[in-house]
Amino acid sequence: MLGGLLALLASATFALSNVTARRGVLTGSVLQALVVTIWLGVPVFLAAALVAGELGAVARIPLPSIAYLALAGMLHFVFGRYCNFRAISAIGVNLAGPVQETSLLVSLALAVWLLGEMLTGLKILGIVLVLLGPAIILRVLRQERAAADDPKSGQAASDDLSKTKFQPRFAEGYIFAALSALAYGMSPILVRAGLRGTDPGTGIAGGLISYAVAALIVAPMLFHSATRRDILALRFPAAKWFTAAGIMVCLSQMVRYMALSIAPVTIVTPIQRLSVIFRLFFSWMINRDHEVFRLGVLGGMFVTLIGALALTLHTEFVLSLVPLPALVIEAAGWRWPGGR
């Protein structure tokens, strides 16, 4: 129960961090966002570890677990976050989000293969829906692009596109969204491997290790003159949003690490997919002129959300809500690996 609640909190704060980062990259650069959010992580996690009295837990974590946590920091906080910021800069949070939901498939496959966790028939249905959501969105966008190229309907499409000030860069956005999904799908396995059998306090110490390694990886970038000029060119409007994003993502990662210390990947990661709905809400509140809110896009997000719920809820709970045929009950309760 506690692991699920922590995962839900991680979902909401991660969504808010994405939305505030999206606002920042309108006037700042992706590298600026990366450096600010990573370097903020070390003092935030250090302060949290001191307040919780868990700083000493760093020394108690065995070396193999430290290696897993260090790899998670490099993969998630450096590579994954860079790709995430490139994606939301190019196509916005609403279009990048459903593609990034496929990270769930990576996490679940690796959890079954490497950690010995299990899937049910209901969870497999959820996987199908999580894949279907981005497919719906891509189909809608292809139809709109075809309409824009059609002289007979070009004016109507043009009028529709003019309702938003934002013009997506689709190829760049979807490539980096897919890369971030791969990184975000692999990192929970590393975190769980490093923290399994511990407690939420040790999760904070584990997050400090991951952030410290990520900060060390990013630090040499300052020796490159062009990168240094880019980072030093950061101005207040973007700095304000990047700082907010950094604080929110630190809180998100903190409770995520705490959740993964006490709950399996197949519980924590699906619950985090509820960030789809949080992203939609926060985007409307903060970035409505810089996002895509077309009906087909919202429909794809809704399908993805239903898939995430199917992956999150216990099969027994769902079957208790509605009387279903015996064949459906048997299919929903099927388990893999292991069958019934």
Each PLM stretch: what is its role?
Residues 40-45, 99-113, 128, 213-217, ...:
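Alpha-helical transmembrane segments of compact multi-pass small-molecule transporters, enriched
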Residues 69-73, 119-133, 202-214:
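Alpha-helical transmembrane segments
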Residues 30-31, 93, 119, 200-203, ...:
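Membrane-helix interface/capping residues of multi-pass secondary transporters
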Residues 33-34, 96, 203-207, 268:
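Juxtamembrane helix-start motifs in multi-pass secondary transporters
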Residues 1-31, 36-71, 81-91, 139-178, ...:
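Membrane-interface interhelical linkers
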Residues 105-125, 135-137, 141, 277-299:
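C-terminal transmembrane-helix exit sites in multi-pass transporters
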Residues 185, 305-312:
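Aromatic-anchored segments of alpha-helical transmembrane domains
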Residues 15, 46, 74-78, 104-109, ...:
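Hydrophobic/small/kink-forming positions within alpha-helical transmembrane segments
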